Amino acid sequence: MQFNVAIMTKRTFGVIGLAVMGENLALNVESRGFPIAVFNRSPNKTEKFMAERAVGKDIKAAYTVEEFVQLLERPRKILVMVKAGGPVDAVINELKPLLEEGDMIIDGGNSLYEDTERRTKDLEATGLGFVGMGVSGGEEGALLGPSLMPGGTPAAYKELEPILTKIAAQVEDPDNPACVTFIGPGGAGHYVKMVHNGIEYGDMQLIAEAYDILKNGLGLSNEQLHEVFGQWNQTDELNSFLIEISTDIFAKKDPETGGHLIDYILDAAGQKGTGRWTVMSGLELGVPIPTIYAAVNARVMSSLKEERVAASGQLSGPSKTFSGDVEAWIPKVRDALYCSKMCSYAQGMALIAKASQEFGYDVNLPEIARIWKGGCIIRAGFLDKIKKAFKDNPQLPNLLLAPEFKQSILDRQGPWREVLMLANEMGIAVPAFSSSLDYFDSYRRAVLPQNLTQAQRDYFGAHTYERTDKPRGEFFHTEWLD
């Protein structure tokens, strides 16, 4: 298809990559009054989009990268929605010689923040702007309003801000209703999105463990689970997108069997890597994030389906049947879930704070909590409390030390511990619940047993140690066999 771009109205915004997220973001931008240009490597995909979803929209398609670039007004604003890694670099390398100083590229995929750092430096050196932008909200969020986490070239963000503010999710907030803010330079946006996904892993695993205890421990039916989760979603503590969709899931019937669909879904969870990246970053920066690690590990364990089935016939465990008051235990499970959730978010925010300090991102933690209130997968009512905690005390070292969260966890730790004991007695694995409680118990202790660890290190490797009766920074070595 040929057209004379010289006589066409220039497009305000361009999208490369027409998988469902790219399509939905293009439609979102167009619906806010911005003329769009689109391009996809496969012409068939472009033609299908133009013949179906783009009909009647102010969207123009290009069938070569050169035509696509010519369609855009300057400074060109190009959103790239392709698979992370090599495909992003390939698109950038194809665009670079066609762009002019001041033009900007936005990577809206789940790219590794280190790749975004490299791309930002490379493109800024040529006079181009680069924005690595985390996009959360899934297909629906992309279309109706996602949570956006842009980082990179500040000047490029300023050009994009009027568009991003309009396409982002909108929430009730006295500071700013749009769920978008400039996260910081370089890979800051993709870093925060990575940690968002890590927290998401933690949230999902904690909910799965609560479900396991309620269903396989207390014996609740799917109808009862639907009712309980619906009630939980009305509470200040647990009101969230993930609890809301879990409520819907328990009610969904399977058209093939007539039974509940949840009972026919294989217990093997997939993952795309952002949870693993979060865990690796936590280790590299020295920030403990055990709940998130447990959640990633739980998905890995779930993938060993055939191996687990074989092991189940050989390795026995407790066979206790619950005989207590079910109604009395449901609120205890709710409290355990909330306490664990607080720990998971505390870990994620601590990791962002450390990365911000280490990489010079200057991340505004209250703003992060604000933009996660709408559009994104981890949106939850208690994010207002997280925002307030960091706004009241910008130097807060850990979310658990904020007055409200401290009191909440202290008030609920009794039921939390009871639920873990019950799970252990019944042989129900609760790795994320357990890791959360271990995190709390470790963080609140002034003295841990790592004095023995350090003594062992000095014994076999002369790694030295500090003494409790001497100032920090003085190191000692002992000849242990003398």
UniProtKB/Swiss-Prot annotation:
PROSITE patterns: 6PGD. Pfam families: 6PGD, NAD_binding_2. The active site is at K193 (proton acceptor), E200 (proton donor). Its EC number is 1.1.1.44. It catalyses: 6-phospho-D-gluconate + NADP(+) = D-ribulose 5-phosphate + CO2 + NADPH. Keywords: Gluconate utilization, NADP, Oxidoreductase, Pentose shunt. One of its GO terms (molecular function) is NADP binding. It is an enzyme of class 1 (oxidoreductase). GO terms for biological process: D-gluconate metabolic process; organic acid catabolic process; pentose-phosphate shunt, oxidative branch. Homodimer. Catalyzes the oxidative decarboxylation of 6-phosphogluconate to ribulose 5-phosphate and CO(2), with concomitant reduction of NADP to NADPH. This is 6-phosphogluconate dehydrogenase, decarboxylating. It comes from Synechocystis sp. (strain ATCC 27184 / PCC 6803 / Kazusa). The gene is gnd.
